Amino acid sequence: MRRYFGTDGVRGEAGKPPLTPEFVLKLGQAAGAYFLAQEKRPVVLLAKDTRESSDLLEAALAAGLMSQGVRVEHLGVLPTPGVAHLTKALKATAGAVISASHNPYQDNGIKFFGPTGEKLPDGAEEEIERLLLEDHPTRGIGTVGDFREAERMYLDFLLAHAPDLTGLKVGLDLAHGATYRIGPKLFQKAGAEVMAFFNTPDGRNINRGCGSTHPEALSRFVVELGLDLGIAFDGDGDRVQFIDRKGRLFHGDHVLYLAALAFGEKGVVGTVMSNMALEVALKERGLAFHRAAVGDRYVLEKLKETGLALGGEPSGHVIFLRHHTTGDGLLTALLTLKALKALGGDLADWYEALPLYPQVLLNVRVSDKAKVMADPRLGEAVREAEARLGGRGRVNVRPSGTEPVVRVMVEAEEGAEEVARELAERVRALSQEAQAV
């Protein structure tokens, strides 16, 4: 059982337990000891996003790693999937990223990639947590470097997958995050006419009213400025959402459907949050559909288990396994545009080709996720909600892996909003009871 690592590394509010500089130093020592056991002269690539706390946590993590004799190569501000790509391409021992993805600036996190460019498996994270309990005297004097070719190498990798975008008017929402420099460069080099929004990070504005979790402003810009489409990234660039020319959200389920048809896939891996309409549409075309737990690491596991190459989440984490080991917002954007070129039409046409079932997702902030989820009354409430839908919808209640939140999802052709609201109130009441005990 992991205490610190969640579905996407270690997360929390920067400066508060567990994300204090003291803890991050110890985490670096434990990770350094782990990497030293894998390789005689370990090299770790280290990148960050644009949060004001990223420099502090980067320094603490680097110091811990170097105290174990690890060489640390600083990559600067770079999207998370860029670190995954470079870790594999440069044959580094590991990659590490200081980021909390789509979370607000007060939060931050640390995630590691192994030499294959995949996130460390659960067993490796458990071993690092075990090593956290031990003292780690200095085993060597690690060195540090600034790898100035990181952005260029990642850009070259992306451009190798880019279609000709000449004449396309694209609005980019960079979320004041890790894609703020490389995003506009990439689409301009591919030939697009680019309008960049939310591309002036100040350490505190990352994801604030913008990015893939808040695409409303981009939707407005696309319609008002007559753009062909909009593309919104999150703070660390591993997820993406699209806006069609009519201002509608073209999300991960639409992308999976479009890409599956364009690239001749045999099937798709979604998650328990994927819309039922995607499953039905794929099966009508003779394509398999599998559901994984939420989190791109679990999508990747299911892809390997099933032998498929395309998977993702409605939130915009999409894995094209033939091209990358993890979700990559920039790569997904390019391959989605390549799919459109192959099949014809634009995002608006393909939005209408997959009418999604109404889905309501409510986030309920709770005091103790584990207590709420273990309460047998929650299971009863879910069964009651399912009974109300009469077999014509789905209910899913799950804890967030990165926030103190329980997510309530109800999907149905009718009545989803009312059922979701009532179920969310039950979750809130259970949380208040648990807090009072």
UniProtKB/Swiss-Prot annotation:
Q: What is its EC number?
A: 5.4.2.10
The cross-references to InterPro entries, in alphabetical order and at most eight, read: A-D-PHexomutase_a/b/a-I, A-D-PHexomutase_a/b/a-I/II/III, A-D-PHexomutase_a/b/a-II, A-D-PHexomutase_a/b/a-III, A-D-PHexomutase_C, A-D-PHexomutase_C_sf, Alpha-D-phosphohexomutase_SF, GlmM_bact
Q: Name one GO cellular component term.
A: cytosol
A GO MF annotation of the entry reads: magnesium ion binding
Catalytic residues per the record? S101
Phosphoserine PTM positions read S101
UniProt keyword Metal-binding present: yes
- PTM comment, free text: Activated by phosphorylation.
Cofactor stoichiometry and binding? Binds 1 Mg(2+) ion per subunit.
**What Pfam family does this protein match (any one)?**
PGM_PMM_I
GO biological process: one example: UDP-N-acetylglucosamine biosynthetic process
Q: What cofactor is this protein dependent on?
A: Mg(2+)
Annotated Mg(2+) binding sites: S101, D234, D236, D238
Q: Which reaction does it catalyse?
A: alpha-D-glucosamine 1-phosphate = D-glucosamine 6-phosphate
EC main class here is: isomerase
| Role this protein plays | Catalyzes the conversion of glucosamine-6-phosphate to glucosamine-1-phosphate.
- State the similarity comment: Belongs to the phosphohexose mutase family.
Identification of the protein by name: Phosphoglucosamine mutase
Q: Which organism is it from?
A: Thermus thermophilus (strain ATCC 27634 / DSM 579 / HB8)
The record lists the lineage as:
Bacteria, Thermotogati, Deinococcota, Deinococci, Thermales
